[in-house]
Amino acid sequence: MGEAMGAADIRRVLSLLPHRYPMLLVDRVVSMVKDQSIHAVKAVTMNEPFFQGHFPGRPIMPGVLIVEALAQAGGVLAIESLGLAGSGKLVYFMGIDGVKFRKPVEPGHLLDLHVTILQAKRNICKFEGRAMLGGQLATECQFTAMIADPPGD
């Protein structure tokens, strides 16, 4: 069994991900099991800049940003599981498969991000992600990412 790694507040998330406003889409980690899974959350507010144009009068979080939130949660899981915190390594998308959007995500929602590692080989991980709203599936996908040095290193 994997080692329980516990919760992480926004300060820890900021130390693990290079993303900053407006692209940081993980607010905190509820729980994490090394080499296995993470449960993180994103509080979706009307202050998100994308709601200005998506859509006026009917704000809905863009699906690609829900997938990005899942990928960021997966990045936290990968960096922590591999003991790479503080290394400067980045997690890059390589592919996304089987994305399904089932419920719209709106201002005021708390988006629960559940990501599981399906496979890890060297510096490449395959994940399964589920974004939930109040226990109901909003978005699901599988994605592959590579852990590597930043460009220019």
Swiss-Prot record:
GO biological process: fatty acid biosynthetic process; lipid A biosynthetic process
Enzyme active site: H54
Localization annotation: Cytoplasm
GO cellular component, one term: membrane
Major location (coarse): cytoplasm
KW rRNA-binding (keyword) present: no
Pfam families given in the database record: FabA (PF07977)
EC number(s) from the headed UniProt entry: 4.2.1.59
Reaction(s) catalysed (UniProt annotation): a (3R)-hydroxyacyl-[ACP] = a (2E)-enoyl-[ACP] + H2O
NCBIfam families: fabZ, PRK00006.1
Family per similarity comment: Belongs to the thioester dehydratase family. FabZ subfamily.
Protein name per UniProt: 3-hydroxyacyl-[acyl-carrier-protein] dehydratase FabZ
Protein species of origin: Sphingopyxis alaskensis (strain DSM 13593 / LMG 18877 / RB2256) (Sphingomonas alaskensis)
Gene symbol of the encoding locus: fabZ
